[in-house]
A protein has these predicted regions:
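N-terminal Rossmann-like NAD(P) cofactor-binding subdomain of oxidoreductases
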Residues: 1-198, 202-205, 229, 234-235, ...
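Charged docking surfaces used in two-component/phosphorelay signaling
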Residues: 184-358
């Protein structure tokens, strides 16, 4: 068993990490850290609202017994040499200060954007760009670290890239236009989205989200040379919106392929990709990497987001689009807090262990 620590344990993403690591066959969570005000408290106590006394636990699943009475530590007291791996669920500013201190000694898997766009840092989605793992060795050499920082992509990027990969490999992709309908949980709980802003409403702007998706999509689908990733040449345009849905990001995707692609062929390639994904034997990997609905009313967040514990990217309404050369369009649904965040990070850790990088 590898000994792991979690920094940011009480937030929405941190809680998903707690669940994803419960009874994990490879990783043992031995240390948890949250904010300064929570240090020294038991985990269950730190989750209580100081004013109302309400328990701020945001999952339908109960708090695992193994963590309820665990004591939260301070970031500055962590000895990274005591762990084989550190997961972080931090805001970007905090991550930029804290993660390099850990990575000098031990691998760090991060959900933050702080280091995603640096030349020697791959943005990894298990099963999509596994060959980019080799860049972590370059990062170690460049920075003189024993460990590394391996960030996940933005949760909106995750489902988009997973569905584009099989299309790109078979038919090539010239251009992608995407509009997202993103769940409120993607904004976190603190500060999150104000109820009066989102109820009976759609917010047509999420700061920096569109730029992240555009850059990350090209980087993840790019090619690796000895020192860096050459971004894919496709054009990416997107509009990201916030909608009154709790969990699950829905995206309407329009693709112009280099070679003609019929809807049935796109479905076939997605299913082939799903069945042959090299992550299938990892503990957290879903039964289906991609699932394609024939029902034109699916996928739907409330109905589909929990399938395979939120680790499957759901696709539906694959159609021709005559507005583009070799045009194709479809709807996808990806669970932003599972595959797009904490459980996706645990899956990445499994991949790195399987590749003997950890």
């Amino acid at each position: 068993m590898l000994r792991v620590a979690l920094v940011g344990a009480t937030g929405a993403v941190g809680q998903q990490f707690i669940l994803a690591l419960n009874r994990h066959p490879w990783f043992e969570l031995t240390h948890i850290v949250s904010s300064e005000r929570s240090a020294g408290k038991k985990y269950i106590e730190a989750l209580r609202d100081p004013h109302s006394g309400n328990l701020r636990w945001h999952s339908k699943e109960k708090i695992p017994d193994y963590i309820r009475d665990a004591t939260l530590g301070k970031v500055e007291d962590i000895n990274p040499k005591s762990f084989d791996l550190i997961f972080t669920a931090l805001e970007s500013e905090e991550a930029r200060m804290i993660e390099p201190q850990f990575a000098r000694w031990v691998p760090v898997i991060s959900t933050a954007a702080a280091f995603r766009y640096e030349e020697d840092v791959p943005i990894l989605i298990p099963g999509v760009n596994d060959d980019h793992v080799m860049l972590l060795n370059t990062q170690r050499k460049n920075r003189g670290w024993r460990g590394f920082i391996a960030p996940l992509p933005n949760c909106t990027t995750t489902g988009l890239v997973i569905t584009l990969k099989p299309i790109m490999d078979k038919f090539g992709v010239e251009m992608v236009i995407m509009t997202s309908l993103q769940a409120v949980s993607g904004a976190g709980r603190s500060p999150g989205v104000v109820a009066l802003d989102i109820l009976d409403n759609v917010i047509p702007y999420i700061p920096k989200e569109e730029e992240k998706v555009q850059v990350e999509t090209k980087k993840i689908l790019g090619t690796l040379d000895s020192r860096a990733i050459n971004p894919a040449s496709l054009k990416v345009s997107c509009t990201c919106t916030r909608v009154p849905v709790l969990d699950g990001h829905t995206e309407a995707v329009y693709v112009s392929t280099e070679r003609s692609c019929e809807p049935a062929e796109a479905k076939e390639e997605m299913l082939k990709f799903s069945k042959s994904a090299p992550i299938r034997n990892l503990p957290t990997a879903p039964k289906d990497f991609i699932f394609v609905h024939d029902d034109p009313t699916r996928p739907q967040p409330r109905v589909d987001r929990e399938i395979n514990d939120g680790m499957t990217t759901m696709v539906g309404r694959i159609r021709k689009d005559t507005a583009f050369n070799n045009g194709l369009k479809y709807i996808l649904l990806s669970h932003n807090e599972r595959m797009g965040s904490a459980k996706g990070a645990v899956l990445l850790a499994e991949l790195l262990k399987d590749r003997e990088v950890l």
